[in-house]
A protein has these predicted regions:
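A conserved regulatory-domain signal marking ACT and ACT-like small-molecule sensing domains
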Residues: 11-162
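Targeting/processing segments of secretory and organellar proteins
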Residues: 1-2
Length: 162
């Protein structure tokens, strides 16, 4: 089933920008729930780029960056998952002591609120990679760029996994 939703079409336009699409999915907090979720992605040939899992007593929220967010959201909805899509910032920082604090100070000093973040791996030496959820993507991208920290768009991210 193809989703013919104007909102999704606009959200998933293939424009080049400096954000990536993160899919957040509610999972029941029980043994095997994450395995079932990832099995669905595997069967659909969806490749995970980043994953974060936060839990509460009754449910968990899994946040994923995937190679094909449009197809993934369709598949998950068809499988009955409650999910949402958020634009987040992926960044490349130097893999050395102090690089993370430099980035965090740049954001904090410029009054950019970091709501959450998580790391991911890519095939590039001497670099570390993070996903950032901030209150104002545009402002954060400007601050990061001015401080020599490179935001990564979806296309850049895909090239790192080839």
């Amino acid at each position: 089933m193809i989703i013919r939703n104007k909102w999704l079409s606009i959200f998933f336009e293939r424009e080049v920008n400096m954000t990536v699409k993160q899919i957040s999915v509610f999972l029941e907090n029980r043994p095997g729930a994450l395995a079932e979720f990832t099995r669905i992605l595997e069967k659909s040939n969806i490749d995970l780029r980043a994953l974060s899992l936060a839990e509460s007593e009754d449910f968990g929220i899994v946040r994923v960056i995937v190679d094909d967010p449009y197809t993934t959201i369709q598949i998950l909805k068809e499988e009955g998952y409650v999910c949402s899509v958020t634009k987040v910032i992926a960044v490349e920082i130097k893999d050395k002591p102090g690089a993370l604090v430099k980035m965090l100070n740049a954001l904090g000093d410029n009054n950019v609120n970091l709501e959450y973040s998580y790391a991911f791996l890519a095939k590039k030496a001497n670099s570390a990679f993070m996903i950032l959820r901030v209150a104002d993507n545009e402002k954060a991208i400007k601050v990061l760029t001015q401080n020599g920290i490179r935001p990564i768009c979806h296309e850049d991210m895909e090239s790192m996994f080839k």
